[in-house]
């Protein structure tokens, strides 16, 4: 699915097939040594050899020619953890 600039997507554990060129999915959420939330997300085959990447609030990732910025990681130590990403490019 193509997204407009400014569109927001929620990424939880498992697959999210709403990303053009995806899927993108959450693999793990936790707090780092400084108490900041971190997420490990998996992406499409063109992310090889890094199938999974660690992201923090403010980081960006690209999928399907679209660039996304992580705006929040919620309840990182909960089974209901998720992150929010906004399309910026």
Task: Name each region found by the language model.
Residues 1-89:
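Surface-exposed, beta-sheet-biased, low-hydrophobicity segments with strongly acidic/polar composition
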């Amino acid at each position: 699915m193509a997204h407009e600039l400014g569109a927001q997507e929620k990424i939880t554990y498992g697959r999210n097939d709403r990303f053009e060129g995806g899927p993108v999915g959450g693999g793990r959420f936790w707090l780092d040594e400084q108490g900041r939330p971190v997420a490990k997300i998996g992406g499409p085959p063109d992310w090889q050899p890094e199938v999974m990447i660690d992201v923090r609030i403010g980081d960006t990732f690209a999928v399907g020619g679209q660039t996304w910025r992580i705006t929040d990681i919620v309840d990182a130590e909960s089974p209901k953890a998720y992150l929010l990403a906004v399309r910026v490019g």
